Regions:
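Short amphipathic, positively biased membrane-proximal segments
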Residues: 1-176
Length: 176
């Protein structure tokens, strides 16, 4: 099956979901398969990256050390996600775009291969793709631990949460 066939199938599932013919959990499962088949889109159009850029702009223009400002910031962020989900309308595509399982696995595999080859410098240079900690002083065991911890945390944030919320609330849940 080619990538075009996979995308066409995902679009058909998404259209069927909009017509109410398939349950949302099936759309979420199809979205997971879409991520597995195609991986993440480029950062220029990846919804998480776009959302991050939007919210950075909102924060830059409206930042204040007050509870009301924080509530407004959270409300704007939630509104953007929910609005994008409602506009997209397809649970399959929303979950497929929001999930980052394939990229997460690829990054972990690259670091694992570097560790198995004994190339600590390469493993250290790759670690920031998974985690924000400074890898400079980490030995092989600490690098491996950082990968396991990061994969565990990011699996919840970047795979389980969008799929679960997509299954429960459709596209707005996956992106909101």
């Amino acid at each position: 099956m080619s990538m075009i066939d996979v995308v066409a199938s995902a679009l058909r599932v998404g259209q069927a979901l909009r017509r109410g013919r398939l349950p949302r959990p099936l759309g979420a499962a199809a979205g997971l398969l879409l991520d597995r088949a195609l991986g993440e889109p480029p950062d220029a159009v990846h919804p998480v990256a776009v959302f991050g850029r939007l919210m950075t702009g909102v924060e830059r223009n409206r930042y204040a050390e007050r509870r009301g400002a924080g509530v407004a910031h959270a409300a704007v962020g939630t509104g953007i996600g929910l609005g994008a989900g409602m506009a997209l309308g397809s649970t399959t595509l929303a979950v497929g775009l929001a999930v980052a399982g394939r990229g997460l696995a690829h990054a972990a595999e690259q670091i694992g291969a570097a560790l198995q080859a004994g190339d600590l410098d390469l493993a250290r240079s790759l670690l920031p793709s998974l985690v924000g900690r400074d890898p400079a002083g980490l030995d092989a065991a600490e690098l491996a631990r950082a990968v396991v911890e990061s994969v565990a945390e990011n699996t919840v944030d970047a795979v389980v949460a969008p799929a679960l919320w997509g299954a429960l609330a459709g596209a707005p849940g996956a992106l909101g």
